[in-house]
Amino acid sequence: MQSQNPLLPGSRYSNFYKLVFFSLVAVYLADCFTPLRLHVDSLRYYAIMECIRYGCPADSSAATDYFPYGYTALLLLFLKLGILKSFAIVFINDIYLFGGLFFLYQVFRKTISPFLFFVIVLLNWIFVKFVAHPLSEMQYIFFSLGSIFFFYQFILRKKIQLLVLSLVFGWVAFLTRTVGITLIGAIAVGLIWEFRVQQLAFLRNNKLLVGGILAILIAALIVFSKPLGINHYGNVLSEHFKEAPFFKRIGWRFKEWGEIFVNTPSNKFIDYVAKAGEFAFIALGLIVFCWFVYRLYFSKNSIPFFIKAYFLFYCLIMFNWPFNDPRFWAPVMPVMAAIVLQLYADEKNKISRLAFSVLFIVYMLLGSFAASYMVYTSFNKKVFARTQAKGVFRTEYEIHFFGKPLNDTATQTDPFVIHVLQKYDR
């Protein structure tokens, strides 16, 4: 007999989720035809790419930018192939996202509904929005979730080739986003946990060898800290820590969790109800986060140990990250979705189950609106120019689309933005 609860595996809503999934596939493919969606970080990637390809002054911002080169390598490849246009950017992002979700589903396939899992991730406003941007999130998701899949298979099958694949995917994820160091750390912890008996015996018998290996690793980290951007990251963070004290960062993180689980950016509400809206998002995020952490780390469940370690390490980074943007959770949001679905299936508390059911309805409605609005703006250039990146590049987009600004507040334009649009838009 099928479950009546829409969030449980085997639910009678399975066919509905299947229909929603294929509708979302159509939406994501339709977004391939969007104009080039620029973001401040997108412009940095294009600047770094052109600096590498065509050269730039050694003291320019592009030459000294600390972004890792993993995503820039993709842009350079597309440039070499002559396909560096908005269509190719969104299409490869779609492939990255769907491929990454497939990898992760294989880890949780015995405990969660496939179409529900895909729908929850694909309907989240963060993915609806940023899959259409030239940003590194989707590439990171593909390689990080691929690394998780291969490591999980290694645990099950004990084949060294799978471990090598996991490390390769993890390394590419790290080269794409430096936060991938949390994944490498989780794999290391997972190996220690999986072979803890053998390693304790090896450690007792080879103390000097282990000490030498650790010393080499530390030395390598020091030597390569500059080319990997670690030094620059440290300097940037130390400056921003002064601007974002601890409790301010904590408030940001819980507000971001509220934005993820309500499935809408908080500014949409804060603009209307001021501080009350912000506090509501923080409160909801705090409640969901506490439930999540308690159920994941302090109650019995079958979530793989290394995935728990990965999420813990990622949270340690995030709760010390001196910037405010829910996009920073995108790399682990699919993992969060899979964990929530599995934990919810074992949830006995009726109040928690009811609360998540209500939240799920709100989530679906707001996600559907976000997906529809995204397609609408992709095919309406006037609205696109006015709303993309909150209108920051409105004048540049209007010049690109219509040959002149359409707004009477236009003052000055950014020549690099116009250059990127003229050269790399579809």
Residue spans of the language-model regions?
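Loop-to-helix entry region of an early transmembrane alpha helix in multi-pass inner-membrane enzymes
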Residues: 65, 69, 73, 81-99, ...
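Membrane-interface alpha helices of multi-pass inner-membrane proteins
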Residues: 117-118, 162-178, 185-188, 314-316
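Hydrophobic, aromatic-rich transmembrane alpha-helices
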Residues: 99-105, 265-301, 315
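Membrane-lumen/periplasm interface segments of specific transmembrane helices
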Residues: 34, 44, 180, 205-287, ...
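Perimembrane helix-loop-helix junctions
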Residues: 2-4, 150-156, 170, 183-215, ...
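Transmembrane-helix signature of polytopic, membrane-embedded enzymes
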Residues: 13-18, 104-125, 142, 161, ...
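Short acidic/glycine- and proline-prone juxtamembrane loop motifs at membrane-interface regions
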Residues: 39-40, 132-140, 325-326
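Membrane-embedded, lumen/periplasm-facing catalytic core of multi-pass transferases
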Residues: 357-426
